[in-house]
Protein backbone atom coordinates (compact mmCIF):
# COMPACT_ATOMS: atom_id res chain seq x y z
CA UNK A 1 0.00 0.00 0.00
CA UNK A 2 1.07 3.58 -0.63
CA UNK A 3 2.00 5.61 2.42
CA UNK A 4 -0.44 8.30 3.53
CA UNK A 5 -0.55 10.92 6.24
CA UNK A 6 -3.41 11.13 8.68
CA UNK A 7 -3.44 14.55 10.33
CA UNK A 8 -5.47 14.55 13.52
CA UNK A 9 -6.35 16.62 16.56
CA UNK A 10 -8.33 16.07 19.74
CA UNK A 11 -10.33 18.21 22.12
CA UNK A 12 -10.42 16.60 25.55
CA UNK A 13 -12.14 16.92 28.91
CA UNK A 14 -8.84 17.85 30.57
CA UNK A 15 -5.08 17.45 30.36
CA UNK A 16 -4.58 14.06 32.04
CA UNK A 17 -4.78 11.13 29.58
CA UNK A 18 -5.16 8.66 32.45
CA UNK A 19 -8.42 10.11 33.73
CA UNK A 20 -9.65 12.64 31.17
CA UNK A 21 -11.43 11.71 27.95
CA UNK A 22 -11.53 12.55 24.26
CA UNK A 23 -14.62 14.65 23.48
CA UNK A 24 -13.93 15.62 19.85
CA UNK A 25 -11.79 13.97 17.18
CA UNK A 26 -11.03 15.42 13.78
CA UNK A 27 -8.72 14.26 11.05
CA UNK A 28 -7.92 14.28 7.36
CA UNK A 29 -6.02 11.72 5.32
CA UNK A 30 -3.68 13.09 2.65
CA UNK A 31 -1.25 11.67 0.16
CA UNK A 32 2.47 12.32 0.56
CA UNK A 33 2.06 15.59 -1.38
CA UNK A 34 -0.44 16.73 1.26
CA UNK A 35 -3.43 16.51 -1.08
CA UNK A 36 -6.61 15.37 0.71
CA UNK A 37 -7.87 11.82 0.30
CA UNK A 38 -11.55 11.41 1.06
CA UNK A 39 -13.65 13.51 3.40
CA UNK A 40 -12.43 14.76 6.77
CA UNK A 41 -13.56 13.18 10.02
CA UNK A 42 -15.14 15.44 12.61
CA UNK A 43 -16.90 13.55 15.37
CA UNK A 44 -17.82 13.81 19.02
CA UNK A 45 -17.17 11.03 21.51
CA UNK A 46 -19.68 10.41 24.29
CA UNK A 47 -18.46 11.45 27.72
CA UNK A 48 -19.31 8.70 30.17
CA UNK A 49 -21.00 9.31 33.50
CA UNK A 50 -17.84 8.59 35.48
CA UNK A 51 -16.07 11.79 34.36
CA UNK A 52 -16.31 15.40 35.48
CA UNK A 53 -14.69 17.44 32.72
CA UNK A 54 -12.42 20.38 33.48
CA UNK A 55 -14.50 23.58 33.28
CA UNK A 56 -11.37 25.40 32.08
CA UNK A 57 -11.01 22.98 29.16
CA UNK A 58 -14.65 23.45 28.16
CA UNK A 59 -14.30 27.23 28.28
CA UNK A 60 -11.81 26.79 25.44
CA UNK A 61 -13.59 24.15 23.35
CA UNK A 62 -17.22 25.04 24.00
CA UNK A 63 -18.18 21.34 23.89
CA UNK A 64 -20.56 20.29 26.66
CA UNK A 65 -20.97 16.73 27.99
CA UNK A 66 -24.63 16.83 26.98
CA UNK A 67 -23.70 17.56 23.36
CA UNK A 68 -21.41 14.51 23.27
CA UNK A 69 -24.17 12.31 24.70
CA UNK A 70 -26.64 13.56 22.08
CA UNK A 71 -24.34 13.42 19.05
CA UNK A 72 -21.29 11.33 19.94
CA UNK A 73 -20.00 7.88 19.18
CA UNK A 74 -19.43 5.59 22.15
CA UNK A 75 -15.83 4.86 23.07
CA UNK A 76 -16.18 1.31 21.74
CA UNK A 77 -17.45 2.59 18.38
CA UNK A 78 -14.73 5.23 18.26
CA UNK A 79 -11.94 2.78 19.08
CA UNK A 80 -13.14 0.46 16.32
CA UNK A 81 -13.26 3.35 13.84
CA UNK A 82 -9.69 4.35 14.71
CA UNK A 83 -8.42 0.81 14.36
CA UNK A 84 -10.27 -0.22 11.21
CA UNK A 85 -10.66 3.02 9.22
CA UNK A 86 -8.08 5.55 10.34
CA UNK A 87 -4.81 4.10 11.64
CA UNK A 88 -4.57 1.58 8.82
CA UNK A 89 -1.31 0.00 7.53
CA UNK A 90 1.23 2.47 6.07
CA UNK A 91 -0.44 5.43 7.79
CA UNK A 92 1.74 8.17 9.29
CA UNK A 93 -0.26 9.69 12.17
CA UNK A 94 0.58 13.40 12.36
CA UNK A 95 -0.30 16.04 14.92
CA UNK A 96 0.97 19.15 16.67
CA UNK A 97 2.37 18.19 20.08
CA UNK A 98 0.69 14.82 19.56
CA UNK A 99 3.62 12.78 20.91
CA UNK A 100 3.24 14.33 24.35
CA UNK A 101 -0.53 14.87 24.35
CA UNK A 102 -2.92 13.47 21.73
CA UNK A 103 -1.12 10.15 21.25
CA UNK A 104 -1.29 9.53 25.00
CA UNK A 105 -5.07 9.92 24.93
CA UNK A 106 -5.31 7.48 22.01
CA UNK A 107 -3.13 4.94 23.84
CA UNK A 108 -5.29 5.09 26.95
CA UNK A 109 -8.48 4.89 24.89
CA UNK A 110 -7.20 1.70 23.25
CA UNK A 111 -6.10 0.30 26.63
CA UNK A 112 -9.57 0.82 28.14
CA UNK A 113 -11.24 -0.78 25.14
CA UNK A 114 -9.06 -3.88 24.79
CA UNK A 115 -6.98 -2.84 21.80
CA UNK A 116 -3.21 -2.94 21.69
CA UNK A 117 -2.20 0.58 22.79
CA UNK A 118 0.98 0.68 20.70
CA UNK A 119 0.50 -1.16 17.39
CA UNK A 120 -1.22 1.81 15.75
CA UNK A 121 2.13 3.66 15.69
CA UNK A 122 4.50 0.94 14.45
CA UNK A 123 2.95 -2.22 13.03
CA UNK A 124 2.57 -2.90 9.27
CA UNK A 125 4.27 0.28 8.11
CA UNK A 126 2.46 2.57 10.54
CA UNK A 127 4.39 5.41 12.17
CA UNK A 128 3.87 8.81 13.76
CA UNK A 129 5.26 12.32 13.35
CA UNK A 130 5.00 15.45 15.49
CA UNK A 131 5.11 18.79 13.68
CA UNK A 132 5.74 20.89 16.81
CA UNK A 133 9.46 20.13 16.99
CA UNK A 134 9.67 20.29 13.18
CA UNK A 135 8.36 23.86 13.44
CA UNK A 136 10.87 24.63 16.20
CA UNK A 137 13.90 23.41 14.24
CA UNK A 138 12.71 25.03 11.00
CA UNK A 139 12.23 28.35 12.76
CA UNK A 140 15.66 28.12 14.35
CA UNK A 141 17.73 27.08 11.33
CA UNK A 142 15.71 27.54 8.13
CA UNK A 143 13.25 30.37 8.81
CA UNK A 144 13.37 31.82 5.30
CA UNK A 145 10.10 32.01 3.36
CA UNK A 146 7.87 31.78 6.44
CA UNK A 147 6.63 34.55 8.72
CA UNK A 148 7.35 33.63 12.34
CA UNK A 149 5.04 35.18 14.95
CA UNK A 150 5.73 37.13 18.11
CA UNK A 151 3.15 36.87 20.90
CA UNK A 152 1.52 39.74 22.80
CA UNK A 153 4.39 39.70 25.30
CA UNK A 154 6.86 40.38 22.51
CA UNK A 155 8.30 36.86 22.65
CA UNK A 156 8.70 34.29 19.84
CA UNK A 157 5.79 31.86 19.79
CA UNK A 158 5.15 28.62 17.89
CA UNK A 159 1.45 28.43 18.67
CA UNK A 160 -0.38 27.08 15.65
CA UNK A 161 -3.00 29.84 15.53
CA UNK A 162 -0.29 32.53 15.56
CA UNK A 163 1.71 30.87 12.78
CA UNK A 164 -1.38 30.66 10.59
CA UNK A 165 -2.31 34.29 11.28
CA UNK A 166 1.21 35.52 10.49
CA UNK A 167 1.18 33.67 7.17
CA UNK A 168 -2.33 34.62 6.05
CA UNK A 169 -3.72 31.12 6.51
CA UNK A 170 -7.41 30.95 7.36
CA UNK A 171 -7.83 29.50 10.85
CA UNK A 172 -11.18 30.39 12.33
CA UNK A 173 -12.32 28.61 15.47
CA UNK A 174 -8.86 27.78 16.84
CA UNK A 175 -9.29 24.93 19.36
CA UNK A 176 -11.94 23.34 17.22
CA UNK A 177 -10.35 20.03 16.25
CA UNK A 178 -11.18 20.18 12.52
CA UNK A 179 -10.10 23.82 12.19
CA UNK A 180 -6.79 22.91 13.84
CA UNK A 181 -6.27 19.95 11.49
CA UNK A 182 -6.91 22.12 8.41
CA UNK A 183 -4.48 24.71 9.78
CA UNK A 184 -1.84 22.08 10.53
CA UNK A 185 -1.94 20.73 6.98
CA UNK A 186 -1.52 24.29 5.67
CA UNK A 187 1.50 24.91 7.93
CA UNK A 188 3.00 21.58 6.86
CA UNK A 189 2.65 22.66 3.22
CA UNK A 190 4.31 25.96 4.10
CA UNK A 191 7.39 24.16 5.46
CA UNK A 192 7.46 21.62 2.64
CA UNK A 193 7.29 24.35 -0.03
CA UNK A 194 9.73 26.80 1.55
CA UNK A 195 12.22 24.43 3.18
CA UNK A 196 11.90 21.14 1.29
CA UNK A 197 15.26 19.73 2.40
CA UNK A 198 14.55 20.33 6.08
CA UNK A 199 11.06 18.90 5.63
CA UNK A 200 12.24 15.72 3.88
CA UNK A 201 15.05 15.20 6.38
CA UNK A 202 12.85 15.52 9.47
CA UNK A 203 10.15 13.32 7.94
CA UNK A 204 12.76 10.62 7.45
CA UNK A 205 14.09 11.11 11.00
CA UNK A 206 10.81 10.00 12.56
CA UNK A 207 12.43 6.54 12.28
CA UNK A 208 13.99 5.85 15.68
CA UNK A 209 16.75 3.74 14.12
CA UNK A 210 18.00 6.78 12.22
CA UNK A 211 17.89 8.85 15.41
CA UNK A 212 19.88 6.13 17.20
CA UNK A 213 22.47 6.21 14.44
CA UNK A 214 22.95 9.97 14.90
CA UNK A 215 22.67 10.09 18.71
CA UNK A 216 24.34 7.22 20.53
CA UNK A 217 26.84 6.57 23.30
CA UNK A 218 29.03 4.18 21.28
CA UNK A 219 30.08 6.95 18.89
CA UNK A 220 29.56 10.16 20.83
CA UNK A 221 29.18 13.23 18.64
CA UNK A 222 27.53 16.60 19.24
CA UNK A 223 24.28 17.16 17.36
CA UNK A 224 21.67 19.87 16.86
CA UNK A 225 18.52 19.41 18.94
CA UNK A 226 15.26 21.39 19.17
CA UNK A 227 13.10 20.75 22.21
CA UNK A 228 10.53 22.54 24.34
CA UNK A 229 12.91 22.10 27.27
CA UNK A 230 15.43 24.51 25.76
CA UNK A 231 15.50 28.29 26.07
CA UNK A 232 13.02 30.38 24.11
CA UNK A 233 15.65 33.10 23.61
CA UNK A 234 17.71 30.62 21.57
CA UNK A 235 14.75 29.39 19.47
CA UNK A 236 14.38 26.26 21.60
CA UNK A 237 17.45 24.86 19.85
CA UNK A 238 20.96 23.96 20.97
CA UNK A 239 23.90 21.65 20.36
CA UNK A 240 23.68 18.62 22.64
CA UNK A 241 26.06 15.80 23.46
CA UNK A 242 25.13 12.18 24.30
CA UNK A 243 26.45 11.14 27.71
CA UNK A 244 24.92 7.83 28.70
CA UNK A 245 21.92 5.57 28.27
CA UNK A 246 18.74 6.01 30.30
CA UNK A 247 16.48 3.40 31.82
CA UNK A 248 13.70 3.97 29.30
CA UNK A 249 15.77 3.05 26.26
CA UNK A 250 16.79 6.59 25.48
CA UNK A 251 19.91 8.64 26.07
CA UNK A 252 20.89 11.38 28.52
CA UNK A 253 22.20 14.44 26.66
CA UNK A 254 24.02 17.56 27.82
CA UNK A 255 23.35 21.06 26.50
CA UNK A 256 26.75 22.22 25.25
CA UNK A 257 25.65 25.84 25.42
CA UNK A 258 26.57 25.68 29.12
CA UNK A 259 29.98 25.15 30.71
CA UNK A 260 30.00 21.74 32.45
CA UNK A 261 32.69 22.81 34.95
CA UNK A 262 30.26 23.64 37.82
CA UNK A 263 28.62 20.20 37.50
CA UNK A 264 31.20 17.54 36.60
CA UNK A 265 32.50 17.07 40.15
CA UNK A 266 29.13 17.11 41.93
CA UNK A 267 28.20 14.02 43.92
CA UNK A 268 25.30 11.73 43.07
CA UNK A 269 23.29 13.38 45.86
CA UNK A 270 24.03 16.90 44.63
CA UNK A 271 23.18 15.99 41.02
CA UNK A 272 19.98 14.24 42.12
CA UNK A 273 18.90 17.34 44.04
CA UNK A 274 19.13 19.35 40.83
CA UNK A 275 17.53 16.75 38.55
CA UNK A 276 14.55 16.06 40.83
CA UNK A 277 14.10 19.58 42.22
CA UNK A 278 10.50 20.66 42.68
CA UNK A 279 9.02 23.58 40.77
CA UNK A 280 9.24 25.73 43.91
CA UNK A 281 12.92 24.83 44.43
CA UNK A 282 13.69 25.77 40.84
CA UNK A 283 12.28 29.26 41.40
CA UNK A 284 14.87 30.03 44.08
CA UNK A 285 17.24 32.83 43.13
CA UNK A 286 20.34 30.72 43.77
CA UNK A 287 19.11 27.59 41.94
CA UNK A 288 21.30 26.62 38.98
CA UNK A 289 19.67 24.08 36.69
CA UNK A 290 21.60 21.09 35.41
CA UNK A 291 21.51 21.28 31.59
CA UNK A 292 20.78 17.61 30.92
CA UNK A 293 17.66 15.90 29.63
CA UNK A 294 16.46 12.54 28.39
CA UNK A 295 16.08 12.07 24.65
CA UNK A 296 13.65 9.30 23.72
CA UNK A 297 14.40 7.67 20.38
CA UNK A 298 10.78 6.75 19.69
CA UNK A 299 9.33 10.24 20.28
CA UNK A 300 10.34 11.84 16.95
CA UNK A 301 13.00 14.18 18.36
CA UNK A 302 13.99 17.00 15.99
CA UNK A 303 17.72 16.32 15.65
CA UNK A 304 20.28 16.88 12.92
CA UNK A 305 24.05 16.58 12.39
CA UNK A 306 26.28 19.44 13.46
CA UNK A 307 27.12 20.18 9.82
CA UNK A 308 23.72 21.83 9.33
CA UNK A 309 25.04 24.83 11.30
CA UNK A 310 27.74 25.59 8.73
CA UNK A 311 25.05 26.59 6.21
CA UNK A 312 23.17 29.89 6.23
CA UNK A 313 24.64 31.37 9.43
CA UNK A 314 23.38 28.41 11.44
CA UNK A 315 25.68 29.02 14.39
CA UNK A 316 24.68 32.66 14.57
CA UNK A 317 20.97 31.82 14.39
CA UNK A 318 21.15 29.82 17.62
CA UNK A 319 23.71 32.14 19.29
CA UNK A 320 26.44 29.51 19.57
CA UNK A 321 29.87 28.93 18.11
CA UNK A 322 31.99 25.88 17.32
CA UNK A 323 34.77 26.86 19.74
CA UNK A 324 32.43 26.98 22.74
CA UNK A 325 30.87 23.65 21.80
CA UNK A 326 34.28 21.99 21.41
CA UNK A 327 35.56 23.40 24.69
CA UNK A 328 32.53 22.15 26.64
CA UNK A 329 32.64 18.77 24.90
CA UNK A 330 36.30 18.35 25.88
CA UNK A 331 35.44 19.02 29.53
CA UNK A 332 32.76 16.33 29.45
CA UNK A 333 35.09 13.82 27.81
CA UNK A 334 37.75 14.47 30.43
CA UNK A 335 35.26 13.63 33.21
CA UNK A 336 33.77 10.22 32.27
CA UNK A 337 32.64 9.67 35.87
CA UNK A 338 30.12 12.48 35.42
CA UNK A 339 28.25 10.46 32.79
CA UNK A 340 28.44 7.36 34.98
CA UNK A 341 26.93 9.22 37.94
CA UNK A 342 24.11 10.48 35.75
CA UNK A 343 23.45 6.99 34.43
CA UNK A 344 23.15 5.70 37.99
CA UNK A 345 20.76 8.51 38.92
CA UNK A 346 18.46 8.05 35.93
CA UNK A 347 18.44 4.26 36.25
CA UNK A 348 17.44 4.53 39.90
CA UNK A 349 15.19 7.56 39.69
CA UNK A 350 12.13 7.47 41.94
CA UNK A 351 9.11 5.71 40.52
CA UNK A 352 5.97 7.72 40.05
CA UNK A 353 3.36 6.94 42.66
CA UNK A 354 1.77 3.64 41.69
CA UNK A 355 -1.74 4.02 40.32
CA UNK A 356 -4.45 1.83 41.82
CA UNK A 357 -6.96 2.48 39.05
CA UNK A 358 -6.46 -0.14 36.29
CA UNK A 359 -7.41 2.44 33.67
CA UNK A 360 -4.36 4.48 34.71
CA UNK A 361 -1.98 1.50 34.83
CA UNK A 362 -1.15 1.26 31.14
CA UNK A 363 2.57 1.76 31.78
CA UNK A 364 2.82 -0.76 34.62
CA UNK A 365 3.95 -3.44 32.18
CA UNK A 366 3.36 -5.21 28.87
CA UNK A 367 0.85 -8.03 28.57
CA UNK A 368 2.11 -11.56 28.01
CA UNK A 369 1.11 -13.49 24.89
CA UNK A 370 -1.67 -15.46 26.60
CA UNK A 371 -3.34 -12.28 27.83
CA UNK A 372 -2.93 -10.65 24.43
CA UNK A 373 -5.01 -13.50 22.99
CA UNK A 374 -7.67 -13.04 25.69
CA UNK A 375 -7.75 -9.27 25.12
CA UNK A 376 -8.40 -9.84 21.43
CA UNK A 377 -11.16 -12.29 22.33
CA UNK A 378 -12.84 -9.66 24.53
CA UNK A 379 -12.66 -7.09 21.77
CA UNK A 380 -14.12 -9.44 19.18
CA UNK A 381 -16.85 -10.91 21.39
CA UNK A 382 -20.45 -10.13 20.53
CA UNK A 383 -22.68 -8.68 23.21
CA UNK A 384 -24.29 -12.09 23.74
CA UNK A 385 -20.87 -13.78 24.05
CA UNK A 386 -19.60 -11.11 26.40
CA UNK A 387 -22.44 -11.74 28.86
CA UNK A 388 -20.97 -15.12 29.90
CA UNK A 389 -17.34 -14.45 29.05
CA UNK A 390 -15.06 -14.62 32.11
CA UNK A 391 -11.49 -15.10 30.89
CA UNK A 392 -8.81 -16.05 33.40
CA UNK A 393 -6.37 -13.21 32.84
CA UNK A 394 -2.80 -13.54 34.08
CA UNK A 395 -2.47 -9.77 34.48
CA UNK A 396 -4.41 -8.47 37.48
CA UNK A 397 -5.22 -5.19 35.73
CA UNK A 398 -7.46 -6.82 33.13
CA UNK A 399 -10.36 -8.23 35.17
CA UNK A 400 -11.36 -4.85 36.67
CA UNK A 401 -10.73 -3.28 33.27
CA UNK A 402 -13.21 -5.75 31.74
CA UNK A 403 -15.80 -4.80 34.35
CA UNK A 404 -15.41 -1.12 33.43
CA UNK A 405 -15.57 -1.96 29.72
CA UNK A 406 -18.86 -3.81 30.17
CA UNK A 407 -20.31 -1.16 32.49
CA UNK A 408 -19.71 1.66 30.03
CA UNK A 409 -20.57 -0.07 26.79
CA UNK A 410 -22.87 -2.96 27.72
CA UNK A 411 -24.37 -2.07 31.13
CA UNK A 412 -27.28 -4.48 30.70
CA UNK A 413 -24.76 -7.36 30.90
CA UNK A 414 -23.73 -6.60 34.48
CA UNK A 415 -24.75 -8.92 37.29
CA UNK A 416 -26.00 -7.37 40.54
CA UNK A 417 -22.59 -7.86 42.11
CA UNK A 418 -20.80 -6.34 39.11
CA UNK A 419 -23.18 -3.37 39.10
CA UNK A 420 -22.49 -2.79 42.81
CA UNK A 421 -18.70 -2.90 42.19
CA UNK A 422 -19.00 -0.52 39.28
CA UNK A 423 -21.16 2.00 41.16
CA UNK A 424 -18.75 1.94 44.10
CA UNK A 425 -15.81 2.63 41.80
CA UNK A 426 -17.70 5.28 39.81
CA UNK A 427 -18.80 7.14 42.94
CA UNK A 428 -15.31 7.06 44.44
CA UNK A 429 -13.82 8.23 41.12
CA UNK A 430 -16.27 11.13 40.83
CA UNK A 431 -15.83 12.18 44.45
CA UNK A 432 -12.07 12.42 43.87
CA UNK A 433 -12.68 14.79 40.95
CA UNK A 434 -15.35 16.85 42.71
CA UNK A 435 -13.35 19.37 44.82
CA UNK A 436 -11.30 20.67 41.89
CA UNK A 437 -14.40 20.70 39.67
CA UNK A 438 -16.37 22.83 42.15
CA UNK A 439 -13.42 25.17 42.72
CA UNK A 440 -13.14 25.77 38.98
CA UNK A 441 -16.87 26.45 38.59
CA UNK A 442 -16.77 29.02 41.39
CA UNK A 443 -13.63 30.70 40.04
CA UNK A 444 -14.94 30.98 36.47
CA UNK A 445 -18.53 32.07 37.17
CA UNK A 446 -18.01 35.77 38.08
CA UNK A 447 -16.22 36.70 34.84
CA UNK A 448 -17.98 34.34 32.42
CA UNK A 449 -19.62 35.66 29.24
CA UNK A 450 -23.20 34.68 28.41
CA UNK A 451 -21.92 31.82 26.25
CA UNK A 452 -19.61 30.66 29.01
CA UNK A 453 -22.40 30.93 31.59
CA UNK A 454 -24.38 28.47 29.48
CA UNK A 455 -21.45 26.02 29.55
CA UNK A 456 -21.12 26.41 33.33
CA UNK A 457 -24.85 25.77 33.76
CA UNK A 458 -24.59 22.66 31.61
CA UNK A 459 -21.69 21.47 33.76
CA UNK A 460 -23.77 22.04 36.89
CA UNK A 461 -26.56 19.94 35.39
CA UNK A 462 -24.05 17.27 34.36
CA UNK A 463 -22.78 17.08 37.93
CA UNK A 464 -26.32 16.70 39.27
CA UNK A 465 -27.04 13.92 36.78
CA UNK A 466 -23.93 11.83 37.47
CA UNK A 467 -23.75 12.51 41.23
CA UNK A 468 -27.37 13.25 42.20
CA UNK A 469 -26.55 13.15 45.93
CA UNK A 470 -24.35 16.25 45.65
CA UNK A 471 -25.94 19.41 46.97
CA UNK A 472 -25.13 21.82 44.16
Language-model region placement:
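N-terminal accessory regions of nucleic-acid-interacting proteins
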Residues: 1-5
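Short acidic, Gly/Ser-rich segments with clustered Asp/Glu that frequently serve as metal-coordination loops
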Residues: 11-18
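Metal-dependent phosphoesterase core characteristic of DEDDh/y 3'-5' exonuclease domains
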Residues: 20-25, 29-63, 85-196, 202-205, ...
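Metal-dependent phosphoesterase signature
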Residues: 61-81
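Long, charge-rich C-terminal accessory regions
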Residues: 245-420
Amino acid sequence: MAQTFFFYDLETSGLNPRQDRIMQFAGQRTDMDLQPIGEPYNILVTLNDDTLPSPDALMVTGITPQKTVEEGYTEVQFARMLSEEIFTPDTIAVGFNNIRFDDEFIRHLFWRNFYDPYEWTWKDGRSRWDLLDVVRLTRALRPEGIEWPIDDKGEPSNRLELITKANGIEHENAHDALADVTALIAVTKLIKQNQPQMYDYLLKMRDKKLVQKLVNVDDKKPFVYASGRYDKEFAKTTVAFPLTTSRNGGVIVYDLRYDPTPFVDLSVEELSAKIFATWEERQAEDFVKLPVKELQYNRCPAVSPLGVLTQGDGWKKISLDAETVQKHQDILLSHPDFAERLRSIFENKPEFKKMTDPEAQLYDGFLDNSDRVRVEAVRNASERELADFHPEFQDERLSPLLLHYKARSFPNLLSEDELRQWEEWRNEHLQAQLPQFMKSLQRLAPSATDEQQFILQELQLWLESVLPSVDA
